[in-house]
Curated annotation (Swiss-Prot):
<protein>
    <recommendedName>
        <fullName>SPbeta prophage-derived uncharacterized protein YoqG</fullName>
    </recommendedName>
</protein>
Length: 85
């Protein structure tokens, strides 16, 4: 498994550092019955959101986005990790 680094406090400035091609793991609704994880790769980052293609644990492929405001408002339930360089 690839080593991931946890981004603990996300700001719009941190979001700008996530470039297209970056491998990410995004955990949604952490600690709840609805928790799910995407493993993917960033395709677009406009500074307020980054969009990524993913594969989930069931093998479904899709695309999604992470919004900086959601990261700020839900720091315990929306977790973003990036691949170590």
């Amino acid at each position: 498994m690839e080593k991931m680094n946890l981004l603990k406090e996300i700001t719009i400035f941190d979001l700008n550092k996530i470039k297209p091609g970056t491998k990410v793991q995004v955990t949604w609704y952490k600690g709840t019955e609805m928790e799910y994880t995407h493993n993917g790769e960033v395709i677009i980052n406009n500074g307020e959101k980054f969009y990524y293609n993913y594969v989930d644990k069931e093998g479904y492929v899709g695309h999604c986005h992470v919004n900086a405001l959601d990261l700020k408002n839900y720091p315990d339930s929306l977790i973003v990790e990036i691949k170590s360089k």
